[in-house]
Amino acid sequence: MKDLTVIVPIQNYDTETQTLLKRAIDSYKKADDGKTKLLFIGPKEVIEKVKEEYKGKNTSYIENENTNFQTQINIAVEKCGEYFSILEYDDVYTPKWFENVEKYMETNNEASIYLPLTQVLLYEGMENGPIGYVNEAVWATSFSNDLGYLDLEVLTSYMNFNTTGGVFRTDDFKKVGKLKESMKLTFWYEFLMRTLFNGKKIFVIPKVGYIHTLNRKGSLSYIYNETLSNEEADFWIETAKKEYMFKNDRNKTFEA
């Protein structure tokens, strides 16, 4: 896809990561039409190893010692073209995802974010295939005010949306304030609400474009689902609802 950069944030390069990353990059190659760029960001010692394995004229690297996901993305977008997408190393694209985005953009070019229908896998039992979908709710009759679009009213009461794999307009991502580092666990939820609050549009393309892995130990979903109490989870949700009206990260240290 022209003017699209795929960001791959990575924190380590152990045997498990190498196996999962190869799977992720293979999916990128199948989806790529030769125009998409690939950008790895991670600590210096990790990037040095990645460089040995993944090379090419459309591949670049950023060495950054801060392994905070939000920081990595915020730094990487400064090196992106008109659009960017995020590929987590334990996830995969479907082969026609970028092609489908381009087709929908031909008739619907007003959205700031194009999300895919996302299949969900459990890390333990990946071989069993998807257990369900996310992002599909906006295509249900009467769910949102405009079929296929996410709206703020719905998002404040329903938060089961996955953003990785989506295609973002880089300038709009910057204009609404990027990701907030202080939002430790619900940063994507807060970002989606902030995007809509600032008058931008989020559209879900009714095509499966991404397969997302849940509950890999150490992942955000694992932390959220397996280690947080109900009170802590509620705290982060409510904090997101209070912070989305502020464009800039207010640099608070939130504690549940």
Positions of PLM-derived features:
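Short, acidic, metal-binding catalytic loop of nucleotide-sugar glycosyltransferases
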Residues: 23-35
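Glycine-rich, basic loop-to-helix element that forms the pyrophosphate-binding segment
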Residues: 64-80
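Short beta-strand-to-loop acidic/aromatic patch adjacent to the donor-nucleotide binding site
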Residues: 82-92
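Conserved donor NDP-sugar-binding/catalytic core segment of glycosyltransferases
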Residues: 96-134
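Catalytic beta-strand/loop signature of glycosyltransferases that borders the donor
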Residues: 117, 203-209
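Short, flexible, basic/aromatic active-site loop/helix in glycosyltransferases
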Residues: 117, 134-158
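Acidic donor-binding loop at a coil-to-helix junction in glycosyltransferase catalytic cores
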Residues: 184-191
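Catalytic core of nucleotide-sugar-dependent glycosyltransferases
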Residues: 208, 212-214, 221-252
